[in-house]
Amino acid sequence: MSSSHTPMMQQYLRIKTDYPDMLLFYRMGDFYELFFDDAKRASQLLDLTLTHRGQSADKPIPMAGVPYHAVENYLARLLKKGESVAICEQIGDPATSKGPVERQVTRIITPGTVTDEALLDARKDNILLAIHTQKQKIGIAWVDLGGGRFHLQELTEEHQLNAELVRLQPAELLCKESTPLPSFCSNFAVKFRPGWEFDASNAHKLLCEQFSVTDLSAFGEQNYPTALIAAGALLAYLKTTQKQSLPHLTTLTLEQSEDYLQLDASTQKHLELFENIHGGGEHCLLSILDKTACAMGSRLLKRWLGKPLKQHAIIQTRQQAIKEIIFLQQDVSLHQLIKQCADVERIVSRIALKSARPRDLVSLLQTLTLLPAIHDELQENKSLLINEIKKEISPLPLLQQLLETAIIDNPPMLIRDGGVIAPGFDEELDELRNLSSNAHETLVKLEQEEKNRTGLSTLKLGYNSVQGFYIELSKAQAQNAPPHFHRKQTLKNVERYITPELKLFEDKVLSAQSKALAREKWLYDNLLEEIQQYIPELSDLAKSLAQLDVLVTLAERAQSLNWNCPNLVPESGIMIQAGRHPVIEPLLQERFIANDLELKPNQNMLLITGPNMGGKSTYMRQTALIVLLSHIGSFVPADEVTLGPLDRIFTRIGASDDLSSGRSTFMVEMTETAQILRQATSQSLVLIDEIGRGTSTYDGMALAYASCAFLASTIKAYTLFSTHYLELTELPKEFSCIRNVHLQASIKTGQIVFLYRVEEGCANRSYGLEVAELAGIPKEVLKLAHEHLNQIQDTQSILVQTQIIKPPTSPVLTELKKIDPDRLTAKEALDLIYKLKHLECAESIN
């Protein structure tokens, strides 16, 4: 460090060395300043003016700054860009400091560890995720620090990792330095951490300390070592950034794929669960479902959608709770009560991290006062799940009383502003406040007492910022000043004195405000520590309120949208009567055309044909969405649904280039198809829409035929397979498990009319030119297209006929199959040769 730097800059550089990868916000008066490369980067990211302060190596030192009172807005913008920030505060007193004011980093904010309300999306989990790979295993661990959840999982394939990242959308990824990552990880803020943080023994030590155990057998130490290393690395990072204990992280939850209906990354995207195809939040499944009353419920609903359950028994407990809420007509009253509840989940996390603000505690108190009303509203409910919820939302009278006596009703935003602790809570604080606020009255009282005691009529008490408090006497009466008056200042006409009593009063008054603030801060910290003992009960309360909110919301959606409860049965199959699309139907002005569907083990595939825009993709997607909704416990848009056991949903719908990975549309399509063909089982629901379009007609049709046949006869998955290759409609003749259906359309007055009804049999034409006309293709182009189509149909179709799928058997081969060579005599063999020669000649002529 150069000695030419000022002491302040030397201090800055010392602190900055500990945070090389973070932007250091260095407090100087009313601003947070940034220097050197931090200043350049911040000026670009935040559009700040870049100035200079001092020099380093004969060059001006770049500087940029933000006002301290507006720092939260700037932090939010930086976090969205994936940046991490270290906040360095002045902790010394400028008035008494010799040299630079003492400073230290008091707060580290990273995208995955932020818990401040102002910096978070209230309706979205904020996830920090760590990845570790070893021995063909991918271990992942993730934490929602604001929600107190800590999970781990072990994977075997990169596509599984991609699916989890798409589902969780982590704000920050941790991995070991120099670890190669798949291209899809580039969409996230990645932090490379030192290798020792991914050490097995270090992970074991940290995790045992966190959960107060001697071994990790309960968390699967033997079976999931890679995931536990990731969990340990994640915990090490949290310890570094939070600089304190994490009492709200009390358990580590192992997620196992066999417990959930699996949705790969493509399926989550194609079904538009959380965002539409353009990346927006409107017109997706979540936007239709999420009418939750509180942020906790909204976040939980999204987690349910991302991880549909497989166990019918658990799903049915949710169904029973929803049925009961509907029957008792509780959805409106409960919604209104829950709407008044605070985000208890995140408040608990801030209490655990000692970063809860005064208004957090007031919001928590308001929620506690609502619990008796919510509990009373649920008195008639008898379903298993609601009974469990009732147990967790019982009142907490001692905590409620503590908060009522400790905090005023409308406190300031920050404890540093004072005026948070209620009068009467602490005698010493009340005295300090009285000294500060009643100084004038006390001064008048002291003056009168001294006059009475001394009999000096000119005696006055005064104050100025230089001399402090003083007793003033005229020159005439000064000679009568009592011995305990100590001269402080001599002026032309008066003498000023101080007494031990007045000095004591001065010390108390002048320091009362700062002492009151310090006392209040101490009391507030102690209050947070006292509330921490209620973290288990408050965490359970938060989970139960969120769960109740989701159940009430699903009950309201079922009634408002005319949805019905699906039947989950052990027998295999999928049956949907009058199914509708859950997203499209509410958006339509006209009536949605409902359609039936039935898939069973001996008839497990529907081969769907029909025109573009005729509703094939809608029919397929609504089937998958009805299945998915059934597996979160929701009612569904259908008159009746019966579902047997299912393990996965796969989709291959639509495609576009993957420019980041250098993959063409056809390559994306084939990659997704390959994953389906390798991973699907007889209990999977598979949607395949138009494969083979990105290559030649012959290759495309051959791939479509082979994929269709393999799914139907080898995998035997429940499959909806749409195609424009009409030649494929011959497949049911070869495979009895395949059924042809089509979406109806007709031509009226020269215009195509889509009927959107699914009918038995195959379409007899594709209506491609009619759809092109609707799209606005110029008439001269359409005329030329019609002429060319007629020429093709009159001569030879560019599409190979059915023989491509099942070529006609050669007469020669047919005859050869009949022969048993061991039984032929010499004469019969000679006759056969002539016969085959004759057949071959006839075949070549044809």
UniProtKB/Swiss-Prot annotation:
**SMART domains (UniProt xref):** MUTSac (SM00534), MUTSd (SM00533)
Return the Gene3D superfamilies for the record. 1.10.1420.10, 6.10.140.430, DNA repair protein MutS, domain I, MutS, connector domain, P-loop containing nucleotide triphosphate hydrolases
Q: Name one GO molecular function term.
A: mismatched DNA binding
The coiled-coil regions, if any, are: none
One GO term of the cellular component aspect? Answer: cytosol
Keyword entries, A-Z: ATP-binding, DNA damage, DNA repair, DNA-binding, Nucleotide-binding
* Name of the protein: DNA mismatch repair protein MutS
Q: Which organism was this protein described from? A: Legionella pneumophila (strain Paris)
The uppermost taxa in this organism's lineage are: Bacteria, Pseudomonadati, Pseudomonadota, Gammaproteobacteria, Legionellales
Gene name on record? Answer: mutS
